[in-house]
Structure formats: C-alpha cells, structure tokens
C-alpha cells in the first residue's frame, strides 16, 4: 500500500475523483503545507494558514500504479494556474503533490516533465509530506453525502466524465 497527498483545488472535487478509482483504498480530505500549527476549514479558507486543501490517497499499486494516480490527478484539475482552480481562488487551492516516500519523487518529476514536454506550463509544487490535518467529518465523502449541493453538481461531473473517458479501465464499476 502507498500513500500520496494531492492538492488540486477544493478537496470535495479531488476526493470524488479518487473515490472512483480502482485500487484506491481510502481518500481522506484534510490540510497540509502551511505554517499554522493547526488547521480547520474556516481558517484554511481564510487563506491565512498557508495550508492547502488536500486529499490523502491510500492505494494498492498492484491495481493502480502511482503513474496512473498522477495522470488522473493532472487530468482532472488545472495544474497551470497558480493559486486557483475554477472559481476557487487562493493559495489554499494551489496545485501540489506531497510525497510520502522518496521513491515516489522520480515518478512525480517524470510525470511533470512529460507534461512540460507536451508544452503544458505546469506550476504544481512538489514537496515531501509534512503534518496532515484531517478535515472535519462534514467534509469527508462530501459529494456522496450531499448530492444536491450546487457547487459540487457544477464542478464534479465534468471531472468524473473526463475520468470515465480517459481512464475507464481504472474506474470503479
């Protein structure tokens, strides 16, 4: 089992994508990367903690390799715009990969370089993982528990459609 932490905008959206990927054992929404010694939704959304909304993804690499996890991540968010994902603006929405094992870094670097070789100006930050602050229970499995939420209904279905189109062999049936 491997773990990687991904920040690609609102964690409700990234969580929904990765809950749909075969081999993903758990997805936990949370906060990471800031200077504040604690984190909660209100403080992080205020933009003053330095933390990012992230998801901690635990996956079985014999089912879904890290390369695919990263390809899904980069395909389902905008890695080219600093501190913004759609209407969500602020450093708490920046694109970032936190690796939990040094052996993951070369794969992350290769994936980003592959995108850059294709002319994509990736601004995604890459850092070793630091303390992870789990988000409040209300933010876990958010879209599945709040199917009528307007923001989610606007932002998540296009990401899931892209996942279905480009990574159908890795989607949970």
UniProtKB/Swiss-Prot annotation:
Keyword Lipid metabolism: no
Function: Has an important function as a repair enzyme for proteins that have been inactivated by oxidation. Catalyzes the reversible oxidation-reduction of methionine sulfoxide in proteins to methionine.
NCBIfam families registered for this protein in UniProt: msrA (TIGR00401)
Signal peptide boundaries: none
Keyword Oxidoreductase assigned: yes
Top-level EC class as recorded in UniProt: oxidoreductase
Gene Ontology molecular function terms on file: L-methionine:thioredoxin-disulfide S-oxidoreductase activity; peptide-methionine (S)-S-oxide reductase activity
Name of the protein this chain belongs to: Peptide methionine sulfoxide reductase MsrA
Keywords: Oxidoreductase
Gene Ontology biological process terms, A to Z: protein modification process
Transmembrane segments: none
Species name: Psychrobacter cryohalolentis (strain ATCC BAA-1226 / DSM 17306 / VKM B-2378 / K5)
Disulfide bonds listed in the record: none
Gene behind this protein: msrA
Family annotation (PANTHER family): PEPTIDE METHIONINE SULFOXIDE REDUCTASE, PEPTIDE METHIONINE SULFOXIDE REDUCTASE MSRA 2
Reaction it catalyzes: L-methionyl-[protein] + [thioredoxin]-disulfide + H2O = L-methionyl-(S)-S-oxide-[protein] + [thioredoxin]-dithiol; [thioredoxin]-disulfide + L-methionine + H2O = L-methionine (S)-S-oxide + [thioredoxin]-dithiol
